[in-house]
């Protein structure tokens, strides 16, 4: 996986991105039906698949590019909004940073110690990929031990 080769991140940057994500970000963790064409015949097959992604959207291109350069995962997309705002002027261009699946796990593990508002969804993604509680016979996890483990994972 590409994120395993990343250098360790500055703790201040991780805390800043966590705050930015709490305020401006969105996280999707759901299972739903998708149409896929991965066969030689005609038509599609329906599959029940997970949708796991996270994104930050704003009109400040510099901040979005900094997030992308700092995390070294995901992609940046420019979105022009059509129509006019309430004042009758044009909407500003929106910039979006987005990542999904294992890259989202990597980012969630970085943000977990500092997240507040989106903490529950972040923990759902981490638990989806790393169900450490299932390794224990009684399904109980010591919260302090888990916090220490997750705080130390990606940092110096």
Model feature map: region roles:
Residues 1-156:
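Internal intein/HINT superfamily modules and their associated LAGLIDADG
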């Amino acid at each position: 996986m590409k994120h395993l080769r990343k250098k360790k991140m500055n703790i201040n940057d991780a805390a800043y991105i966590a705050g930015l994500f709490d305020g401006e970000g969105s996280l999707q963790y759901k299972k739903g039906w998708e149409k896929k064409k991965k066969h030689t015949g005609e038509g599609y097959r329906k599959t029940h698949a997970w949708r796991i992604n996270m994104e930050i959207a704003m009109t400040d291109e510099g901040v979005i590019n900094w997030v992308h350069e700092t995390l070294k995962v995901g992609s940046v997309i420019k979105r022009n909004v059509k129509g006019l705002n309430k004042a009758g002027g044009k909407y500003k261009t929106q910039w979006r940073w987005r990542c999904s699946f294992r890259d989202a796990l990597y980012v969630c593990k970085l943000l977990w110690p500092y997240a507040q508002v989106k903490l529950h969804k972040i923990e759902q993604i981490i638990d989806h990929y790393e169900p450490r509680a299932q390794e224990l016979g009684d399904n109980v996890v010591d919260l302090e031990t888990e916090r220490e483990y997750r705080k130390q994972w990606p940092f110096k």
